UniProtKB/Swiss-Prot annotation:
One of its GO terms (biological process) is ATP synthesis coupled electron transport. Belongs to the complex I subunit 5 family. It holds the Pfam family Proton_antipo_C. InterPro entries: NADH_UbQ_OxRdtase_chlpt_su5_C, NADHpl_OxRdtase_5_subgr, ND/Mrp_TM, NU5C-like, Proton_antipo_N. The gene is ndhF. It is a multi-pass membrane protein. The chain crosses the membrane at residues 9-29, 40-60, 89-109, 125-145, 147-167, 185-205, 221-241, 258-278, 283-303, 327-347, 354-374, 396-416, 425-445, 547-567, 606-626, 718-738. This is NAD(P)H-quinone oxidoreductase subunit 5, chloroplastic. Gene3D superfamilies: 1.20.5.2700. The keyword Membrane applies. GO terms for cellular component: chloroplast thylakoid membrane. NDH shuttles electrons from NAD(P)H:plastoquinone, via FMN and iron-sulfur (Fe-S) centers, to quinones in the photosynthetic chain and possibly in a chloroplast respiratory chain. The immediate electron acceptor for the enzyme in this species is believed to be plastoquinone. Couples the redox reaction to proton translocation, and thus conserves the redox energy in a proton gradient. Its EC number is 7.1.1.-.
Length: 740
């Protein structure tokens, strides 16, 4: 076993050859490199599979013999300065390694088909390989400086992947927004690291925890300063894990390709913030005020993310806000000191949410054949509906992922979320009420997404089935708001959206490729005014096997991964507890290992009842009773069921505006920060251009004219120049004499 640990340092570097070789190949041998494009995807999957096998072996060793293995090398720069780097293997590291590699492999397989049409296929796999290297280096780091180095690399990879389609202005703005927002948190993290080093003199985790605890116990340092350093450290995870108030980048990050959303913004990158808080929990736990701040940020994020997801029409943005809310649950658990529950939910949520994102990608991929290659249309749920019979496998996988996130047993997220809700009851009644209420909201908005996407009929062709001759249709904006626009009665929407029916022009390149495998056509014959009308309609088709296979594997994880936290005997033994022995849990310090099954079933019944209530409300409001686009809006659904529609209209309008406008937080940042900074920049530019440059240029121009004047007075004679020079010197000294 010791021999195995000695080679753990190589884990982050195994996927690195792919981005290096791809980058060099595209620069030096572009044609040959592009001809081997499928080889690069296979190599990426193969290398990451090696890391996964290595990680599984390390995890088994951790379960058998729970230990911490650290190996550090020292790089001495001079007698007073040296830098230490190495690797740190413990149960937390093993969990993150398995999570990164399993989800990463499945996303790479999925991407091989999903990105096959894109001209940036090789660039995509180069970025993915570099991102995997950065994440693996982050979770195996042995000190804070090493973590910060890989933390920044992860941020850079996120910037590149979110802005992968950088020719689209929206994607370019989204990656800049993500980069700048994360820089705020990263700056705080750097200040916190430097502050802790100034106090403790060490960056190594074990030394840092020991020195930090001794300083607080012996009261040898200012507690306020340590609290400030701890909060600055926490700023990094706030930004990286999209916690309030630095959450604004996550929904915009959905402008990247869907596989990126599954890997970075569901399973790994946003989990990096949770990982760092879990890694530094022995440091945070001795400062009660910081623990309360962590739990407070978590509970605010839970509620905010859930409410913002209520009125989203873009399927990926709805899932993004769901991710934000679920990360809040993990942060709440860490703030309560429930280390095991937080990491358990990190695992279950990662697989369930990756399944949902890949499912949404399959839906988008199928819808693109119908509505064209515009995210405004292919991701908009108001143009979907009735996909059950067209994409049955995707529908089944998406439904089970939705039920898991809702907390329905025996799916994965039920077990972990139930633990967090139970622990919140012990921590704070107010926090428990908010957490339980948000569990109901989660079930509501997740089932809303499912119903709008799969139930009813395909809304793209709705006007053709309604039987009404309407002179208007609904133009869907980026956020899904319907704006009624007048059009010609003879205007045909379908041929425009199908883009010549048999070929789809890539949204990102002029090259076309066939999409026959993703579309089916049906001919409808109708009788109007005694004449036969023949029209052909196109419907989405189930995705290819290379897209479905990763979804089915993630479906198995969603079904069975919760078993690692289920007690296997009367003593309460389970795999997760064995892996985290000894673990931190402030809420169950004096509890025995025996499982109170009565209490478990009571709490589970309560949480499942809340989830079913949310599902029932969503079903009542969004089940399509009749064919009308108006039925898909939250407002009109409440009007139909409410006895007092005016009050409901005001309430739901307020809620809709809150969700649609992102709780006005983006607007606040735009008005108070962005526009203020731009005004300040314009004023500084004016001062620099007109005042600073004006003075400099004025001196130069004055000297020029004085020289020209002198030249004409002197008549180009040296004696005249000498006389003028001496006269000026005499006048200068005379002036000084007068002043004195």
């Amino acid at each position: 076993m010791e021999h195995t640990y000695q080679y753990s340092w190589i884990i982050p570097f195994i996927p690195l050859p792919v981005p290096i070789l791809l980058g060099g190949g595209l620069l030096l041998f572009p044609t040959a490199t592009k001809n081997l494009r499928r080889t690069w995807s296979f190599l990426s999957i193969f290398l990451l599979s090696i890391v996964m096998i290595f990680s599984l072996y390390l995890s088994i060793q951790q379960i058998i013999i729970s230990c911490i293995h650290q190996n550090v090398w020292s790089w001495t720069i001079n007698n007073d300065l040296s830098f230490e780097f190495g690797y740190f293997i413990d149960p937390l590291t093993c969990i993150m390694l398995i999570l990164i590699t399993t989800v990463g492999i499945l996303v790479l397989i999925y991407s091989d088909n999903y990105m096959s049409h894109d001209q940036g296929y090789l660039r995509f796999f180069a970025y993915m390989g570099f991102f995997n290297t950065s994440m693996l280096g982050l979770v195996t780091s042995s000190n804070l400086i090493q973590i910060y180095f890989f933390w920044e690399l992860v941020g850079m990879c996120s910037y590149l992947l979110i802005g992968f389609w950088f020719t689209r202005p929206i994607a370019a703005n989204a990656c800049q927004k993500a980069f700048v927002t994360n820089r705020v948190g990263d700056f705080g993290l750097l200040l916190g690291i430097l502050g802790l080093y100034w106090v403790t003199g060490s960056f190594e985790f074990q030394d840092l925890f020991e020195i930090f605890n001794n300083l607080i116990l012996n009261n040898r340092v200012n507690l306020l300063f340590l609290t400030l350093c701890a909060f600055l450290l926490f700023m990094g995870p706030i930004a990286k894990s999209a916690q309030f108030p630095l959450h604004v980048w996550l929904p915009d990050a959905m402008e990247g390709p869907t596989p990126i959303s599954a890997l970075i913004h569901a399973a790994t990158m946003v989990a990096a913030g949770i990982f760092l808080v879990a890694r530094l929990l022995p440091l945070f736990i001795v400062i009660p005020s910081i623990m309360y701040i962590i739990s407070l940020i978590g509970i605010i994020t839970i509620l905010l993310g859930a409410t913002l997801a209520l009125a989203q029409k873009d399927i990926k943005r709805g899932l993004a806000y769901s991710t934000m809310s679920q990360l809040g649950y993990m942060m709440l658990a860490l703030g309560m000191g429930s280390y095991r529950s937080a990491l358990f939910h990190l695992i279950t949520h990662a697989y369930s949410k990756a399944l949902l994102f890949l499912g949404s990608g399959s839906i988008i991929h199928s819808m693109e054949a119908i509505v064209g290659y515009s995210p405004d249309k292919s991701q908009n749920m108001i143009l979907m509906g009735g996909l059950t019979k067209h994409v049955p496998i995707t529908k089944t996988a998406f439904l089970l992922g939705t039920l898991s996130l809702c907390g329905i047993p025996p799916l994965a997220c039920f077990w972990s979320k139930d633990e967090i809700l139970t622990d919140s009851l012990l921590f704070s009644p107010i926090f428990a009420i908010i957490a339980c209420s948000t569990a109901g909201l989660t079930a509501f908005y997740m089932f809303r997404i499912y119903l709008l996407t799969f139930e009813g009929h395909l809304n793209t062709y709705f006007l053709n089935y309604s039987g009404k001759k309407s002179s208007s249709f609904y133009s869907i904006s980026l956020w899904g708001k319907e704006d009624e626009k007048k059009i010609n009665r003879n205007f045909c929407l379908v041929p425009l959206l199908t883009m010549n029916n048999k070929k789809g022009a890539s949204f990102f390149s002029k090259k076309t490729y066939k999409i026959n495998n993703n579309v089916r056509n049906k001919t409808l014959i109708t009788v109007a005014n005694g004449a036969l009308n023949k029209r052909t309609f196109y419907y989405p088709h189930e995705s290819d096997n290379t897209i479905l296979f990763p979804m089915l594997v993630l479906l198995l994880f969603t079904l069975f991964i919760g078993a690692i936290g289920i007690p296997l005997n009367q003593e309460g033994f389970d795999i997760l507890s064995k892996l985290f022995t000894p673990s931190i849990n402030l809420l169950h310090k004096n509890s025995t290992n025996f499982v109170d099954w009565y209490e478990f079933f009571r709490n589970a019944t309560f949480s499942v009842s809340i989830a079913f209530f949310g599902i029932f409300i969503a079903y009542c409001l969004y089940k399509p009773f009749y064919s009308s686009l108006l039925n898909l809006t939250l407002l009109n659904s409440f009007q139909k069921w409410s006895s007092n529609p005016i009050c409901w209209e005001k309430l739901i309008n307020c809620l809709y505006n809150w969700s649609y406008n992102r709780a006005y937080i983006d607007t606040f940042y735009k008005k108070s920060l962005t526009e203020s900074i731009r005004r300040l920049a314009k004023q500084i530019h004016f001062f620099d251009k007109r005042i600073i440059d004006g003075i400099t240029n004025g001196v130069g121009i004055t000297s020029f004219f004085v020289a020209e004047f002198t030249k004409y007075i002197g008549g180009s004679r040296i004696s005249s120049y000498l006389f003028l020079y001496l006269s000026y010197v005499f006048l200068f000294f005379l002036f000084l004499k007068i002043l004195n």
